[in-house]
Amino acid sequence: MVKQLRSQRWIRLLLFIGITLAVASDASAQDYVRDSEPKLFSYDELVQLSLDQPLSPELTEKLRVITTTPFINNEAYYAGSRPRSLNVKDLGPTLRVAFWNIERGLELDDIQLFLTDKDRFMTKVEAERKEAKEKGRSVRDVALEKIPQEIELLQAADVWILNEVDWGVKRTQYREVVRELANTLHMNWAYGVEFLEIDSKQLGTDTFDDKENEQERQQLIEQFSVDKDRVRALHGNAVLSRYPIRDARLIPFKVGYDWFKETKITPLEKAKRKAALLVGEDLLQETRRGGRTALFVDLDVPEVSGQRLTVVATHLENRAKPKVRRQQMEQLLSEIRDVHNPIVVAGDLNTTGSNGTPTSVPNMLYKRYGSTDFWTTQGVQWATGVGIAYSATRGALKLAGIQTRIDPTSANIPGLSANLERGLFSTVEKFRFADGKAFDFRGVPEQTVNGKSGTLADSNQRLGRGFAPTFITEFIWKKLRVAKFKLDWIFVKSELNSPRDKKGSYLFAPHFARTMTDLNNFTPEPISDHSPMTVDLPFHDPSDRGKTSK
């Protein structure tokens, strides 16, 4: 009898504990924001933002809110989506993180296709490459055998960090790019607005009165007309995750480039400043409200220290000198100094060594407005007809020293081998968190996909000389066809106290960094002007590092 009573008590106790845990779990789940976003602008408000006149207090406040308030969506979590089990040989259970500057999302359809139907994507693009070659168009050389594996690597990533993500912009068919991609991946997402794209051509308000030919003027008006009910004009960064999002913050940088005031300078004043002669500075005005930001997202990841992972998506200023980008990075670091859990920082840091990203005229126009066919024909003629003037000779000379700038971590030797980006990397390497931890700067051959070593090789793929370039662009000059840069970076804070300590902990440390150039360049027109990257972060310290396999 006594034993029976004790047994019943234990059963009741276990039931009570089970119910308590279930309730606690449900309560925790209820804490996740299901779908939240700041108020968006109407078309008339966007037009007001584009005018060079003081804003009303209400519009000023609305602009402040949308550039400091992240969108948060955990619908995937509530629909039952959970992280996929990834077990990497000799690493064990692992989190794979992907980063990609997706160039507005101009080729979102191709991204969605390779994520959902690899074979159909391969067949489609092989046919497109064949057709392009038959028409005499050049396509980039790729290793076809690597592409299926690169697709599978991206498919297995449970966290995606994105730059240049459009929302309601005509060039990307007014699509909510982050929402569509998150639906494809069955991921939760956070989105931070950097800019309101309020150039007169983006809003369809340009009347092109400078054109003498009325037929041509009407053609341009039609080309740049917009759907006033669909345009939202947002552009920013995003974090997508199969882990639920606990919280997110959006912090604008205090220093940078004023994309609104600077574009209001007249063409004559710009000519006096010789801005049009600087290769790498955009050749058409790009009027925007807002500025560069850092998006901080806290994910609930039970497998890591503190059961929390902080992910930071950022895009440092291209229209600024390297010292300004370093200052932006310093501000970002100050925001995470007191974070004790693991951190991943990723973004296009624009480490060109100058105040601009080199590009060709057609690519710049396509990136700005979309519609490849238009910009490869009359669009370029129109653009050059309204004052795009620059010196090809000077440009070629200026680019001669930077066409393969693929190791901005190298020493800065003024007069011999200048590298003005070195200061940014020194800042990150010297930085210490409040708990004494540091970012992982190691480059151990056994932890890389190709056996290469050197600074940051574990988290950013290196080649024989420098890093694998993440940005490749063609130019119009015969003697300088291609420029290659390492602009995109991943930094990881795990359990390491010294950035280069090879004997330190490898728990959640970066392994097997990859830059997927072949996949990105497989399509006749590259999917983006930047290639995607991945890094593997093991949930346990690998037991036998010396035998780590690729």
Stretch-by-stretch model annotation:
Residues 100, 163, 314, 346-349:
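Active-site flanking residues adjacent to catalytic metal/cofactor-binding acidic residues
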Residues 141-144, 152-160, 230-234, 277-296, ...:
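Alpha-helix-centered segments that form part of catalytic cores
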Residues 12-22:
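Bacterial N-terminal signal peptides
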Residues 224, 231-235, 242-327:
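Catalytic-adjacent loop/helix segments of enzymes that bind and process anionic phosphate/sulfate esters
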Residues 30-84, 245-250, 299, 322-323, ...:
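Metal-dependent phosphoester-hydrolase catalytic domains
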